[in-house]
């Protein structure tokens, strides 16, 4: 007989932290936003795909805005008040995500751009011709 399986959701622990780090990785195809504690342990994450978009719509600033809003609301539920933001990548969703986190009521301590810049390393992709 087939067993009725419950959905695979974990019970979220109440965290006793008031500060965190929001990592925004913005690529040309998607924007991934991760909330971690000060040690770097992931608490929660969201992306353009998890908020319901697929394909080229994931890379839009609006998808990044929805993902950042989801992260900010969950962070406020968990009791976080202050965050520092680390941004990585050249994508379109960077500014929209930062503005949304600030507007949601989280106090932003610092904004750091940690985009890796090569000192003439690997050969880059070919230039797009549209």
Curated annotation (Swiss-Prot):
Matches recorded under HAMAP family: Ribosomal_uS11 (MF_01310)
Protein name: Small ribosomal subunit protein uS11
Gene Ontology MF: a single term: structural constituent of ribosome
Organism: Kosmotoga olearia (strain ATCC BAA-1733 / DSM 21960 / TBF 19.5.1)
GO cellular component: ribonucleoprotein complex; ribosome
Subunit field text: Part of the 30S ribosomal subunit. Interacts with proteins S7 and S18. Binds to IF-3.
Transmembrane segments: none
Signal peptide: none
Keyword line: Ribonucleoprotein, Ribosomal protein, RNA-binding, rRNA-binding
Record-linked PROSITE patterns: RIBOSOMAL_S11 (PS00054)
GO biological process: translation
